[in-house]
From Swiss-Prot:
Cofactor(s) needed for function: Mo-molybdopterin
Residues that coordinate or bind Mo-molybdopterin: N72, Y75, E76, C130, T165, N217, R222, S233, I234, K235
InterPro entries: MsrP (IPR022867), OxRdtase_Mopterin-bd_dom (IPR000572), OxRdtase_Mopterin-bd_sf (IPR036374)
Enzyme Commission (EC) number: 1.8.5.-
Family named by the database record: Belongs to the MsrP family.
Organism: Actinobacillus pleuropneumoniae serotype 5b (strain L20)
This protein's name: Protein-methionine-sulfoxide reductase catalytic subunit MsrP
A GO molecular-function descriptor: molybdopterin cofactor binding
Compartment annotation: Periplasm
UniProt lineage: Bacteria, Pseudomonadati, Pseudomonadota, Gammaproteobacteria, Pasteurellales
Cofactor: binding details: Binds 1 Mo-molybdopterin (Mo-MPT) cofactor per subunit.
Modification note: Predicted to be exported by the Tat system. The position of the signal peptide cleavage has not been experimentally proven.
TM spans (from-to): none
GO process annotations (BP): protein repair
Length: 318
């Protein structure tokens, strides 16, 4: 797992201090929601604390939680970065069902509770790189997608894993009004190759910062693929289908010359309208505290994933 060196003290440094205090007191993970040792109490039941295995100890640069939950792309709730937090606050995620179907021997459905207790949860601290050339570092909570794939027992025909976001225009104003939702033909669809899905880095996340995902971050369950641009990490998933054929994904349909199927982070392949060689780091400061850094190949996960693309021309297959 990649490590991060803190170049500055951010508010989220309190997060690690807090965890050590909790453990020293002999309290469980539920204590992470307590308001008296560094964080304000959450009012929403959706944001209750989770039980999970901590990430390995380290000195990480974490993006402030308020930036992670307040600066989002989730066009189902509007195209402005602040719109998801504003318009998703009453989004209902329970009851919920996640259907597993297609080329599998064992199709099944998980309900809301089963999303959190079917597989052991663990924390993964990952870089997150948006195709818009900004980045964060986020402590996700979830489980390896490979665990779900193994439970489904894909057949030999299963070459791709397709993900579908909820389609509910009554709850998602961007689906009701195409202008408000960025002109997308909903529901949102993404996909991985079966090999990408089985990579140990690929995560199905149900939380961040020790709590359930907020609605604007893709509650109750979303994909996290840290070596790909953020639009591949589909949110609020209701169906996962195993297929023999590669689908055309949402952004691939909308603008195929700008957004390819693979969407691997690559500083050597620019977006048609901007460079991908560097990125703006979302930190604790405001607009005047902008920090840029060089973008790493595969977002810094080259050692773990480069073998998946051996022999593939990444400038053509972007």
């Amino acid at each position: 797992m990649n490590r991060f060196t803190r170049y500055d003290v951010t508010p989220e440094a309190i997060f690690n201090q807090r965890r050590q205090i909790i453990k020293a007191m002999g309290l469980g993970a539920a204590a992470l929601s307590l308001p008296n040792i560094g964080f304000a109490a959450e009012k929403s039941d959706q944001l209750k604390a989770l039980n999970f295995k901590d990430a390995p100890k380290g000195d990480f640069l974490l993006t402030p939680e308020n930036k992670v939950t307040g600066y989002n792309n989730f066009y189902e709730f509007g195209v402005d970065k602040a719109s998801p937090a504003k318009f998703a606050k009453d989004f209902k995620t329970d009851p919920w069902s996640l259907e597993i179907a297609g080329e599998v021997e064992n199709p099944f459905v998980l309900n809301h509770a089963q999303l959190f207790n079917t597989f052991p949860l663990e924390e993964r601290i990952y870089r997150f790189r948006c195709v818009e050339a900004w980045s964060m570092v986020i402590p996700w909570v979830g489980f390896e997608l490979a665990r779900l794939v193994e439970m489904a027992k894909p057949t030999s025909k299963a070459k791709f894993v397709i993900f579908h976001t909820l389609h509910d225009p009554e709850q998602m104003p961007g689906q009701k009004n195409k202008f408000f939702g960025g002109g997308i033909d909903y529901p949102y669809v993404e996909a991985l190759t079966i090999e990408e899905a089985m990579n140990p880095l690929t995560l199905l996340s149900v939380g961040l910062y020790g709590k359930m995902l907020p609605p604007q971050n893709g509650a109750p369950i979303r994909l996290v693929v840290p070596w790909k641009y953020g639009f591949k990490s589909i949110k609020s998933i209701v169906k996962i289908t195993f297929s023999e054929t590669r689908p055309r994904t949402t952004w691939e349909k909308l603008a195929p010359h700008e957004y390819g199927f693979y969407a691997n982070v690559n500083p050597n392949v620019d977006h048609p309208r901007w460079s991908q060689a560097s990125e703006r780091v979302i930190g604790s400061g405001g607009l005047l505290a902008v920090k840029r850094q060089d973008t790493l190949m595969f977002n810094g996960y080259e050692k773990e994933v480069a073998h998946l693309y051996k022999g593939l021309d990444l400038k053509v297959n972007f």
